[in-house]
Structure formats: structure tokens, C-alpha cells
Amino acid sequence: MALVSAVPLNSKLCLCRTLFGFSHELKAIHSTVPNLGMCRGGKSIAPSMSMSSTTSVSNEDEAPRRIAGHHSNLWDDDSIASLSTSYEAPSYREGADRLIGEVKNIFDLMSVEDGVFTSPLSDLHHRLWMVDSVERLGIDRHFKDEINSALDHVYSYWTEKGIGRGREGGVTDLNSTALGLRTLRLHGYTVSSHVLDHLKNEKGQFTCSAIQTEGEIRDVLNLFRASLIAFPGEKIMEAAEIFSTMYLKDALQKIPPSGLSQEIEYLLEFGWHTNLPRMETRMYIDVFGEDTTFETPYLIREKLLELAKLEFNIFHSLVKRELQSLSRWWKDYGFPEITFSRHRHVEYYTLAACIANDPKHSAFRLGFGKISHMITILDDIYDTFGTMEELELLTAAFKRWDPSSIECLPDYMKGVYMAVYDNINEMAREAQKIQGWDTVSYARKSWEAFIGAYIQEAKWISSGYLPTFDEYLENGKVSFGSRITTLEPMLTLGFPLPPRILQEIDFPSKFNDLTCAILRLKGDTQCYKADRARGEEASAVSCYMKDHPGITEEDAVNQVNAMVDNLTKELNWELLRPDSGVPISYKKVAFDICRVFHYGYKYRDGFSVASVEIKNLVTRTVVETVPL
């Protein structure tokens, strides 16, 4: 690892902006990072920070530190400040509202006898196609009632064999049944995967003709999409996924580059659990007009596409302003001075924007970006930079939850502590106005548990202790921080979350336990080698190997990944189970945050190394607009 030189913290008064724009002055910080002050028996200790990230030889006055050597922030602050917001003119909003009305009229035509969408031979597929299209184009929030009406109609004709293309279609149709299974299940309707049994031949196998037409390929593509919404024990869904994956990979070798091939490549790569809605919308806008296999009037496709582009760009202008606000917050709190840590606030905000595209959810997007960034800095303090003595002091300060606690902290910790204290309290107070109950104490308790898990891991690192797999996972589910990044932003969304519902989503619910376990395990499969190189031996992989002497590292990784796959199916069920009593829309927020982190760990540790995939995501969904 390369040496990282410490940069002095700003000695001026630190003007701190809270999440909602209020400001106040913090006490001046007069010491620099290499001259840290901390309380011990009334004496000030000033340890040096100049040491290797892999070895440390300290004398009486030096504290050994490990530094990870993370790369710097990739997004130039001046460039972010100069981003244009060219779609804020009222005329764009007026144009979008006009198109929304026209699309609503198209939905209304579905209830007209003998209308363009009501042929008894194709009406079911028409409805499913409309619902699927507005969802993938990112404009579904405007048509909630219309979507419910369309799906109620489809479900009224659903049978144990699935459906045909229309209510009088007769023969079960692969495309309509697969799309119906996926869409109805995602909207909370009770549909069995056994409908897919009726799409097999007499040998119990999925089959298709040797001639791979565009229509047939799209049929199998929807079968693949449906197979991903699997519950535990659904062998038919596993078989459908295996068959459709092989078929689509073979088709890619035969068809020319096109919108269809682009869509196949995208879905095979991202599936469902690493597929972020705005990211898919950006792809789907590019390929939407190329499907010529479905008998939808050209004018209808054009209206949907025009609305999707306008909505994407209007939201794009809002996203840029929010990102500029986040960048100012990052600078005002002095985060650029913390040179030993990762700075991924732009990436975190982008990920939030990819799952929450309602303009009203600004507090959620900014809150997620800020909390995730602060957690990342704390992670680097507890895992690498802080000494055990400093970490004990910081942990005690968080337990007291009192600004006066910072007097005994090293200077570099003071600013971080106050950033957390200010923003969490402010967000909790704003959430309390919405929820009508004490979210401040609720948030504080969740942070106490989170910090407690951090100090436990720090003790393991300091002592060289390698826990059992179960011991590690139980602590790791808390230390990952997904509960923190989910809970507080979710409480600002504007809909009530009474304790009765919250307890089904938050700790200690099974839903929360599954999301935390999935993310801890998935993250460890991508991080364990780099963590080990920094002296952080405990991981899901290494602890599993400890519990199973003789197993190879590769086999341990495969076992952990298999656990993730099984837990993911359990999470699907917890999200969509019809008997939970909690609306899917409430749980979907936490589920989508799980998808965010799943995406970040798809290729590597995307939160330590900002990969080309993450950079492309920021460019495609935040920096660039869609050509109209």
C-alpha cells in the first residue's frame, strides 16, 4: 500500500449546513490532523500519522495507523457546480402534463368495448404490455389507478394454466403468461409459478423452435424476467431461468447488433436484484421503439417514448441541483480534508436517484447520500485509521449523543462526530413532523447498535481474533450499515410508518435480517482479499473457512454466494407475500436500497474502487440528458 499524507483540517470556523439548509457555527478547530489531540488523564497526546499502511513501528509518542490508500474523489467539484439544468422551463412540465393526459386516455380505451385494446383475442397482452412499458420507461407513478385497473382485469382471467393473449385466446401463451406472472406477482397478486409447467413439452422440458424469430426471442426474454421473481423451493422457476439464460445467450450469437440484442445483454447482466429502475429506464428509452413484433399503433409508442424522455430530462435538472447541494454540504463540513477516507458522496446520491425518481422525494435522495457518505468515513476510521484508544473514545461519545463529548476526541474525529450528530438529529426531527412520533430517540438507538458493532470489529482486528461464521455474521449484519441507510431516509418519504408497520420492515423483522445478511455476505465476497491485505482478517469467507477446515478459498466463496442466492429468494417472498399486512410499496423502499448495494458489489467493491460501471452510471443517469 502507498503512503497517504495527512492534510491539515481547516482551522477556520466550520460553517456546517444541515440536511435541510439551516446553518450554525461549530467551535474552531485549531489543530491539524498530524497533531491530534485527545484526552487521557488530563494530558494531550499528539501521535504522528506518517507511517506505512502495512507496517507500523511506533515509539512512545507515535500511534500506529493503517491506511487503505483509497483513490481520491473522482468528481471535480467545479464541474458539478457548473452542470446545467436546461429542462426547468415551465413549457417542459406543461408538455409532460399534456402527454400524461393522453396516456391516461389510452389506458381508458382499454375499457371500451371493441376498442383498439379490447379485442378478445389480444386484450390481456395489450394491458400487460402497457403496464410493463410505463414501468420500464420510468413514468408509472403517473398511472397508479390505471395500472391497478388493467391488472385487475388480467387477473380476473388468470387460470392455473396461465392466460392466452386475450380473454378468448384459448391456448396458453408463453409471452403473456410469463409477463403476467412477473407483473402480477410484483404487484401483490397471488399467482403460482406452476403455470409454467404448462409451457413444457411431454418430456417436462421447456422447448422452442430451432428458428429463433424476434417474436420467440422476446417470449423467452419475458420468461427469463419472470424466473427472477422466484420464491424459496420453486424448482420450476430455477428451470425456467436456466433454460431462458442458455437460449438467450445462444440467440445473442446469431442475431445482429440491435435494440433487442442490447436489451438481452442488459437483462442477462443485471437481472432484477442488481437492476436499478432509472438505469433500466435509460437503456429502455434507447431500445423501446425497435420492437416491431407487437401490434401496438405507432402513435401510442411515440407518445410513451416522448413522455419518458421529457420526464427523464425534467428529473435530470432536479437531480443536478440536488447533487450541487450535496457537493456544497460535503465541502462545508470539511470532508475533503479527510484524506485517509473514501469520498463517494456523488456515487451514493446517484444510486439513490436511480431508485427514487419521484421529485417529491428529495429528502430521501439527499439523506441517503449523506448518511452513506458519513458511514463510509466511519468505516475507514474504525477499520483502518483510528487507534483502539481513539475508537473507544468515539464509541463512548456516540453513546452519550452529546456535542460536549467531542472535547475528548482527536480533531479529525470531532468534525465527523458533529456531521453525524447534526444531520441525524435534523433528519430525525423532520421525520418526526411527518410520522408524529419520536423518531429522534429511535434513530439514536439504531446508531448505538451500529457503532457497537463497529467497535466489536475493531477489537477483533486489534486482537487478531477470528470469530466463528455465525458470530461474525450476527455482528456483521449490523456493522454493514444497511439499516441506518434505509431507516432514516425512508422516514422522510412523506407517508406514515406507524410502529406496527415499521416493525415489519426494520429491526428485528425477518425482512430487515435478510437484507442485512445478504448485503454483508455479498459485500464480503468482493472485499475480503483487500480487507485481509489491510490486516482485517475477519470476513464471511475467512470465518467460513475457519468453521470448515480443509475447504478451499474458492469453495468458501461459492458457498457464501449460494447462501446469498437462497436468502435472496427468501427476501423476494418477504417482499411480495400476500399475507404480510404491510403494503409492498412500503417494503419496496428497503428492498430497493438492498438492490443499490447489490449493484455496488456486482463486479468488485464498487464503494472502495469507483469502477468504470459506477462512473458510467453517474454519467448516464445524472450528467447526461436524453436527446429528444
Curated annotation (Swiss-Prot):
Mg(2+) 2 binds at D379, D383. Mg(2+) 1 binds at D379, D383. GO terms for biological process: alpha-pinene metabolic process; diterpenoid biosynthetic process; green leaf volatile biosynthetic process; terpenoid biosynthetic process. Keywords: Chloroplast, Lyase, Magnesium, Metal-binding, Plastid, Transit peptide. SUPFAM superfamilies: Terpenoid cyclases/Protein prenyltransferases, Terpenoid synthases. Residues 1-18 form a transit peptide. Mg(2+) 3 binds at D531. A motif (DDXXD motif) lies at residues 379-383. It is an enzyme of class 4 (lyase). Its EC number is 4.2.3.121. Its cofactor is Mg(2+); Mn(2+). InterPro entries: Isoprenoid_synthase_dom_sf, Terpene_cyclase-like_1_C, Terpene_cyclase_plant_C1, Terpene_synth_N, Terpene_synth_N_sf, Terpene_synthase-like, Terpene_synthase_metal-bd, Terpenoid_cyclase/PrenylTrfase. One of its GO terms (cellular component) is chloroplast. This is (+)-alpha pinene synthase 1, chloroplastic. It comes from Pinus banksiana.
